[in-house]
């Protein structure tokens, strides 16, 4: 276990978000917890999911799905946290109603044990940056917790931000004529009105490296289907 932590520390650099480092360290303290990356589809559009799993055999890619019941135990009428995370982030290609969105992926849904969501988002952003142009928040609904994640990305110097435009269906004026950057701004307008372009939900985010994915792969904590 000490060796795994040393290997992880070799991947760290000054730019990495400290919350991500903390979550990686917590994962590596557990002997068999990793992240499953798998492909799906929805209405003819490709989806990708990033989910915490228990790795049974990394060589054969055998795993078991974690559930909320894995995150705590009941003892002496008390609820005790096990330290095992549960959760997922699902992303998808932009739907027609979304707009082109600069070719980025769009978050379709997410749920995670408190404190372990940002790591899944980090993996999703790195993957989407290598397999597309980046990642943008759900265009209509973002939870308060997820909103803090996006606000953090907006302030990080190692994350590239690209402004997305409104679509013709949005009740605000578009910023430019070209449509390639058009992306539904329902959530941005709902929280910021005419200043929607200043909302963290109005951007597409990307990352130039895969340091977190590389570290998790090196530790045998990524399963890809």
Where are these regions (language model features)?
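Non-catalytic substrate-recognition and accessory regions of acyl/acetyltransferase enzymes
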Residues: 8-114, 122-225
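Residues forming the Rossmann-fold NAD(P)(H) cofactor-binding site
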Residues: 118
């Amino acid at each position: 276990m000490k060796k795994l932590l040393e290997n992880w520390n070799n991947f760290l650099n000054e730019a990495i978000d400290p919350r991500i480092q903390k979550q990686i360290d917590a994962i590596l303290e557990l002997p068999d917890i990793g992240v499953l990356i798998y492909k799906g589809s929805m209405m003819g559009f490709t989806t990708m999911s990033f989910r915490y799993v228990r790795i049974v055999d990394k060589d054969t890619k055998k795993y078991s799905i974690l559930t909320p019941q894995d995150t705590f135990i009941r003892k002496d009428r008390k609820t005790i946290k096990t330290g095992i995370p549960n959760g997922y982030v699902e992303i998808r290609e932009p739907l027609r109603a979304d707009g082109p969105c600069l070719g980025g992926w769009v978050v379709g849904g997410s749920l995670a044990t408190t404190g372990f969501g940002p790591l899944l988002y980090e993996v999703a952003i790195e993957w989407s940056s290598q397999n597309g142009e980046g990642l943008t928040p759900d265009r209509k609904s973002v939870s308060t917790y997820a909103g803090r994640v996006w606000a953090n990305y907006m302030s990080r110097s190692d994350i590239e931000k690209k402004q997305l435009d409104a679509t013709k269906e949005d009740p605000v004026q578009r910023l430019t004529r070209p449509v390639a950057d058009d992306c539904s701004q329902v959530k941005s307008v709902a929280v910021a009105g005419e200043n929607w372009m200043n909302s963290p939900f109005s951007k597409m985010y990307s990352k130039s490296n895969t340091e977190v994915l590389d570290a998790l792969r090196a530790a045998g904590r990524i399963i890809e289907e």
